[in-house]
Amino acid sequence: LKNTTVNYPSLLTSALYNTVEGFAIKYGVTYTKSFANRRSYAIMPEVRYGFANKTLTANLSGNYFYDPLKRASAGFSVGNGIYDLNNLGTMSQLSTSLNALLFERNFPKFYKRTFITARTNRELATGLQGAASVGYAKSESLNNHTDFSVFDFKDRNFTSNNPFMPGADAPLFPVYKSLNFNASLTYTFGQEYMIRPDGKFYQPSKYPTIKLNYRKGINGVLDSDVDYDFIGLEISKDRINMGLAGYSQVFAGAGKFLNNKAVYFPEFQHFRGNNSLTASPDIRRFLFLDYYLFSTNREYLEAHFEHNFAGLITNKLPLVRKLKLEELVGINYLTQPLKSNYTEYYFGIQRLFLRATYGFAFDKNKQVEHGFRISYGFN
């Protein structure tokens, strides 16, 4: 059909394995329709079935891009699914499957969510984007349903699906209902843009981006069990050019639950931790922080800095120069009531999408962990 595209993954990439669902299939397609006035809409159905827990979930999302000059859209999501307890994500689907099948490790933990959400997004001024959403959901804890692994390691066992009680299948939280409202303002300083017939396109800015976010859990309406107010502020810059010395990137975020009368774990403020040898590169990712144990329903401050020397040192070494390696150093920092002054330092090398780093983690100036980390993908 004219001006229509359908994107669908291969069945191979849709297969997965974890200890909650066992072997499972997660399959979704994206149908996009474009119009002469440069407006478009996209429909995204998805189904998922776990063979061990015998659970079928399905959901449907849609987005309508109705004003390309104002970068405006409206959308919805409805259905249910199996989701990571950490809404920032932990491991990729492939890494989760390989760790469970080959190494008897089930790092990610999951829960079931049934939901309906409406959202909107629009440019309010050049460089200033506003977004809002309202959603109603029912959330349920899940248990493991299989302990199959190709190799059986005598010194380890799979842990439960509760990260705080790894030896017992106790629910992390009761079944609860939530009515949530989210709003955010994102502003990029010195934002330049280009207008074409098919829309308004932002150009990379030399200045940072700030984001103000507010989340509210509305109690009592539609039997909603949650009751909280969260406000957060983030500032980031993905590429700060330093000439021949390379480039840097930085992210800092702070937030506080102004009211936390009823906050269940999926609603906590989460962080991008890492329990594995491998991880996708991300300026917000810690190298050694647990995925779940330090999520908070109080206040926090996190900061991340990384500098890539872009071959400044390795290019001076005749034999190494041909490898086109890039040197990098970085620091990650977190403080919150349960994890005060946690700091990571790391250094490493990178070649295209593959990087190897060695890091040290300190908790209140006491070294608590160190080791190698391998990352793949683009940051």
Where are these regions (language model features)?
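Exposed, low-structure sequence patches enriched in small/polar residues
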Residues: 1-379
